[in-house]
Amino acid sequence: MNKKFACIGIVGHPRHPSALATHEMLFHWLVARGYSVMVERQIAQDLGLKDAVTGSLAEIGQKADLAVVVGGDGNMLGAARVLARYDIKVIGVNRGNLGFLTDLDPDNALQQLADVLEGEYIDEQRFLLETIVHKENQQCRISTAINEVVLHPGKVAHMIEFEVYIDDRFAFSQRSDGLIIATPTGSTAYSLSAGGPILTPSLEAIALVPMFPHTLSARPLVINGNSTIRLKFSQIGSDLEISCDSQIALPIQEGEEVLIRRSDFHLNLIHPKDYSYFNTLSTKLGWSKKLF
């Protein structure tokens, strides 16, 4: 039997009234069942929950056993980068569009969540990527990503010239619009749209996917998940950026390099007991249906 939960955190940034209604429904349902509940501070303000215990994402990560993220995959990614630093499990209620990472159907969320709270769930650990933009003898800039790290131009699209080193060995050079470095979790996101492979979540692997390469021979590359990737540039003629999950952007200046490696943190993502990754591929992404 899996671990049961005593303190539940409710997080997410609602963009429409139906999502906010789901937050409110969850709060009252959990309180009625006797659970200790922490609500992300902004949500409590939006709902007018004056007597609720509130906190930041970090405080919820420190004190709660389980975080319920209400929203779409963007909400999950933003919350997960913070919550991955703490010993807390995370599950999502889908109030977005695709909802690849948010398993619970809002129309049936309470029944599914009741089973999860009784210990009926599947536990997964999803690793993150750490990105470091640095130059010798200067302060570096660091961020993390659940899905992918993307090298791309800043404001105006243009060709980028760069070299890729894997574990300090030259791997390839490229002229392209950029490069996607994806985790297994992110292999079904931006990387997939660029022709990258699908990596099942338990794989210890990283995918490197070129973006519009100016060659007929460039192909996606899958490497060991413990490898260190270094991006070098002969010169940076105009704005370049590294983005993490399309939410955080780190500018790259002349003379700087980019280091990407597996983070020390991981996300404790849980699913309902009947969860199937391949069924999710089918229902969310139109993966091949069963023939017989």
UniProtKB/Swiss-Prot annotation:
Catalytic activity as recorded in UniProt: NAD(+) + ATP = ADP + NADP(+) + H(+)
Compartment(s) of residence: Cytoplasm
Gene that this sequence comes from: nadK
Protein name: NAD kinase
Keyword Ubl conjugation included in the entry's annotation: no
GO molecular function, a single term: NAD binding
InterPro entries, per the entry: ATP-NAD_kinase_N (IPR017438), ATP-NAD_kinase_PpnK-typ_C (IPR017437), NAD/diacylglycerol_kinase_sf (IPR016064), NADK (IPR002504)
Origin superkingdom: Bacteria
EC number from the UniProt entry: 2.7.1.23
Family under the similarity heading: Belongs to the NAD kinase family.
Residues annotated as the enzyme's active site: D73 (proton acceptor)
Function according to Swiss-Prot or TrEMBL: Involved in the regulation of the intracellular balance of NAD and NADP, and is a key enzyme in the biosynthesis of NADP. Catalyzes specifically the phosphorylation on 2'-hydroxyl of the adenosine moiety of NAD to yield NADP.
GO biological process, one term: NAD metabolic process
Chief place of localization: cytoplasm
GO CC annotation terms, alphabetical: cytoplasm
Keywords: ATP-binding, Cytoplasm, Kinase, NAD, NADP, Nucleotide-binding, Transferase
UniProt entry tagged with the keyword NAD: yes
Positions annotated to bind NAD(+): D73, G74, N147, E148, H158, R175, D177, T188, A189, Y190, S191, L192, S193, Q247
Uppermost EC category: transferase
Cofactor entry: a divalent metal cation
Pfam families xref list: NAD_kinase (PF01513), NAD_kinase_C (PF20143)
